[in-house]
Amino acid sequence: ETRELEDPAYSSNPTDRCYACKRELHSHLAPIAEAAEGARVLDGVNLDDLGDHRPGLQAASEAGVGSPLADLKIDKSCVRRLSKALGFPWWDKPAQPCLASRFPYGEAISHDRLRQVGHAEAWLIERGFARVRVRSQGLSARIEVPQERLAELLAPELRDALVRAMLELGFTSVSLDLEGLVSGKLNRVIPG
């Protein structure tokens, strides 16, 4: 079991939070690989991941983790095509980045807050919103779904149920992000 939440370099949620998380993860995986002679830790990083803000890649590199998909220049669309051809049932599963990415940088992360966001997203997924993010900003829940589905959340019955569910989870207000679901949105605050 990893303990990244016990590390302030992770739980304080700085812009390089992923570095602390991956460092912790790889510190647990390295001994397992060492115990299995000739084994090496590999990850699923693909070519598309290399263009985004990914401080965890540095921790993986430092730990000697291999990234065969990226090394072979395989991108996300290729991973999906190969997965479909191989009959994997999850070939078209939407990306689900770490729940810590739902919090603005600098806003502390805890087990309870991660659980709250996880339950909020599960509520929406159960209602057919496979691609969803619930961004936690203080006590507010900001809902992101693909732009073409925004209107569905404004239908009175679903809207009222959504607000009730978010309030029951401990949020004090609920808003809908009119820009829709945009990957990496929180990284806009990072200079460069």
Enumerate the predicted regions with their spans.
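Short, aliphatic-rich beta-strand segments
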Residues: S136-Q147
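C-terminal, charge/polar-rich interaction regions
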Residues: V132-V134, A151-L158
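Mid-to-C-terminal catalytic subdomains of enzymes
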Residues: A70-K76, R80-L124, G128-V132
